[in-house]
Swiss-Prot record:
GO BP annotations, alphabetical order: cell differentiation; nervous system development
Taxonomic superkingdom: Eukaryota
Role according to the record: RNA-binding protein with binding specificity for poly(C). May play an important role in neural development.
PROSITE patterns attached to this UniProt entry: RRM (PS50102)
Listed Gly residues bias regions: 1-14
Protein's name in the database: RNA-binding protein 45
Glycyl lysine isopeptide (Lys-Gly) (interchain with G-Cter in SUMO2) cross-link site: K34
Keywords from the named record: Cytoplasm, Developmental protein, Differentiation, Isopeptide bond, Neurogenesis, Nucleus, Phosphoprotein, Repeat, RNA-binding, Ubl conjugation
MF GO annotations: RNA binding
Length: 476
């Protein structure tokens, strides 16, 4: 168990979960030296804005700092600017190790990963249908450098749907836009485009969208990951569900009418949403809509997680596949299996037996790891013996979730001299140990910034190798 020491506004008082994440993305996560004090953190981070709380995670028994801290700002833009300017900096003249700074995930979201920069730069806005992309750019350029603007249009008529996206170059600029733009735009962070098969537990569904829908938090919408495992296992066993025609397009039926904006807000929970459409039928009191995703995996996930979802409360929506002329049965079975593995990998496994289940349990152990990527990988090579001296360690960041251990070992052993791969429990990071520096450098060159099985890897050099016992106690 961990404990935390804080330096809040009332002598160590730590706010509740609700105030910790209000407003969203206003809290940063720091990896620092174990000797860094709360006072130093306040001195270095106060120039970025109003600090509401600072606390350092400590060992429950020894009260020693674990090298992890949190800083809570009053505004999201302040936290983002602190992240942008302080990540990779040294806190003091005597410090030789640069700190790591991330936007911390909402504690009530059910997710256990940190938010990546690219998730914080694109905002979703509701605009007048008469707006052009130039009008949209003109309205939002005052908040920062815009990478692009886009307006969602009806694919048949080309008419604007009154929805748009604005992507900024920096997270702080997007946060400034959300905080300061006219309330009529209902600006909020959009789901990142590069997410392929994320889970609701991993997505940061903003509170603003929940308020617009009048719905309960997503943690209640998707309460138990075991249900998804069961559903996908059933799907993979050739029962009636497995025989259902699968496509990227979904039909949504409800006894209560809904608007395109409401439908979009519900199905944008699952990454990869392409468009929503609600046909007008003056002779029917029912709601009917069509939803299409960019990939089949997202459509499958949306179908099996949102079918039967109550919106509004008491009214269950019916979600089914619409035939789009594709036949992808075998591909879907593989995707479904991989998605189950990804879900299990992203959970917090607090015991050794649970970690062993992740690595060895279930059907995954009986199959060779499946690697889908456009990266040219070398052939598999034998691992080095566990007792081999460590010559180089790599630090790996996963977005949106860690890959399974067997897949990671299959990937990193291809460069030769691999000793061990391990994941940090509850985080989307891990370490790779090599017995040869050349092998480690080849892994960095080949894998850094690449996407494997829908997961983007950041691969970089970690600290110099130390004794295993000291290393494990150093930060976590």
């Amino acid at each position: 168990m961990d404990d935390a020491g804080g330096l809040g506004g009332s002598g160590g008082f730590r706010p509740g979960v609700d105030s910790l994440d209000e407003p969203p993305n206003s809290r940063i996560f720091l990896v620092i030296s174990k000797h860094t004090s709360e006072l130093v953190l306040r001195e270095r981070f106060s120039p970025f804005g109003d600090i509401q709380d600072i606390w350092v995670v400590r060992d429950k028994h020894t009260k020693e700092s674990k090298g992890v801290a949190f800083v809570k700002f009053a505004r999201s833009s302040q936290a983002c600017r602190a992240m942008e300017e302080m990540h990779g900096q040294c806190l003091g003249p005597s410090d030789t190790k640069p700190i790591k700074v991330f936007i911390a995930q909402s504690r009530s979201s059910g997710s256990h990963r940190d938010v990546e920069d690219e998730e914080l730069t694109r905002i979703f806005v509701m605009i007048p249908k008469s707006y052009t992309e130039e009008d949209l750019r003109e309205k939002f350029k005052v908040y920062g450098d815009i990478e692009y603007c886009s307006i969602i249009k009806n694919k048949v008529t080309g008419e604007s749907k009154g929805l748009g996206y604005v992507r900024y170059l920096k997270p702080s600029q997007a946060a400034q836009a959300i905080e300061n733009c006219d309330r009529s735009f209902r600006a909020l962070l959009a789901e990142p485009k590069n997410k392929v098969s994320g889970s609701p537990e991993q997505d940061d569904y903003s509170s603003g969208r929940q308020e617009a829908l009048g719905q309960e938090p997503r943690a209640n919408l998707f309460p138990f990951v075991g249900e998804q495992q069961s559903e996908f296992s059933t799907f993979d066993k050739n029962d009636s569900r497995g025989q259902e025609a699968v496509s990227k397009r979904l039909s949504v039926v409800s006894r209560v009418p809904f608007t395109e904006e409401q439908l979009f807000s519900i199905f944008d929970i699952v990454p990869g949403l392409e468009y929503c459409e609600v046909p007008r039928d003056p002779y029917s009191n029912y709601g009917h809509g069509v939803v299409q995703y960019f990939n089949v995996a997202s459509a499958i996930y949306a179908k099996y997680k949102l079918h039967g979802f109550q919106y509004p409360p008491g009214n269950r929506i019916v979600v089914s596949f619409l035939d789009d002329g594709s036949n992808m049965t075998e591909l879907i079975r593989k995707m479904a299996t991989q998605m189950v593995a990804a879900q299990l990998a992203s959970m917090v496994w607090s015991t050794t037996s649970q970690q062993q289940f992740l690595q060895y349990g279930g059907n995954a152990a009986s199959q060779a790891p499946q690697i889908q990527t456009d990266v040219v990988l070398p052939s598999c090579k034998k691992k080095a013996p566990p007792e081999t001296p460590v010559k180089e360690r790599l630090f790996v960041v996963f977005n949106p979730h860690p890959l399974p251990l067997d897949v990671l070992e299959d990937i990193f052993c291809r460069f030769g001299n691999l000793i061990e791969v391990y994941l940090v429990s509850g985080k989307n990071v891990g370490y790779v140990k090599y017995a040869d520096r050349k092998s480690a450098n080849e892994a960095i060159t080949t894998l850094h910034g690449k996407i494997l099985n829908g997961v983007r890897l950041k691969v970089m050099l970690a600290d110099s190798p130390r004794e295993e016992s000291k290393k494990r106690q150093r930060t976590y």
